[in-house]
UniProtKB/Swiss-Prot annotation:
Region Disordered: start-end pairs: 132-271
Keywords for the protein's UniProt record, in alphabetical order: Cytoplasm, Phosphoprotein, SH2 domain
Annotated source species: Mus musculus
SUPFAM superfamilies: SH2 domain
Protein name in UniProt: SH2 domain-containing protein 4A
Pfam families attached to this UniProt entry: SH2
Amino acid sequence: MLRQILSDMFIDPDLLAELSEEQKQILFYKMREEQIRRWKEREAAMERKESLPVKSRPKKENGKSVHWKLGADKQVWVWVMGEHHLDKPYDVLCDEILAEREHLRAAKDSELRKTQSLELANSLKIKSQNCDLQAMKKTEPQNVTRKAASEEASGQGPRAIPTRKDDKAQTKPVKEKDHEEMKQTEDEKTKQIYKSWKEDSEWQASLRKSKAADEKRRSLAKQAREDYKRLSQRGRSGDGLQNPLTGPQKPRRPPLPPKPQFLQPLGIPPKSLGNQGVIRTEISSAQMDTIRWFKEEQLPFRAGYQKNSDTIAPWFHGILTLKKANELLSTGVPGSFLIRVSEKIKGYALSYLSEEGCKHFLIDASANSYSFLGVDQLQHATLADLVEYHKEEPITSLGKELLLYPCGQQDKLPDYLELFQ
């Protein structure tokens, strides 16, 4: 099943929904490995193609070309953000970008206000100058005559007229003061806007969520790699396991087991399962295909049986929905589990009750062995071997899921009857 997913580079959304978070991360890790492998193959093919002699094309006049910068290893120089010790953290870069944006916005607003105020002042100044000129033209001859007459009568000479330099000397401190006030106002507004950005609760919440999500993804990916290595090492020396590096060895089919002894729910006496007029529900074509697959390919490998007897294991169930599996486990305690036949793949689904709730893991049985989807290092010969192994070894390192308490049948008739009749 895993090989099929990696070949198509696609997984059905319904199938993906049944995977646990750990299995999803491992599957994505394997798909990424497959992408890299295909990319390397294409690169090697391109290099072989480029090494062949090619007719040189005539160069165009003033032709433009791109040359990549090469590093010390003669490969294309690449800089990965965040790996160098001098690189700034992500949140610091965000703060600097926001501060720069607000500074530019405040400067632009200040420049606009300054331009508008200058235009207004110039227009008022021009109007006042026009009015003064008109008034001076009317009164200047009279004032000059009157002033000259008064000066001659008093015997004093004409007084010096104030020059334009004196006016500039008086207005210069005023302009400098206005400029300082405007600059101070601009700085205060920039600080205020930046502070409001920093204190914005939604922005802070989204930043925290993104950091937490990144940290969780890194942790899950790291844990998946560690599980990958740990299980591969254990798989080399485990009993009842197959090493995928040498390929799954197809076991010889044993003879068909005898008619199973069905486990009855507690408090209900055993009854003959002959022709009792059992009411059957309509079975879909997908269920019929699953039943046929189980009878033809799984019964010879004692799927659903206890390890050392001809009795159906208490943890084994038939074709159950996700909702029904959750209902059965809801009456149990953490550590309870069941294995049900899956309609999505040629395999099974292990439903497990943890402290946080129900978890579901897909078991691939397409290669005549049993392993969790995504973790293809440990391939068990039977379902019972898989259960026995994970009674002591947790399914995932993060969840520490140990198969402690099998969840049995709760109805009068077991839900796996159709698989064995």
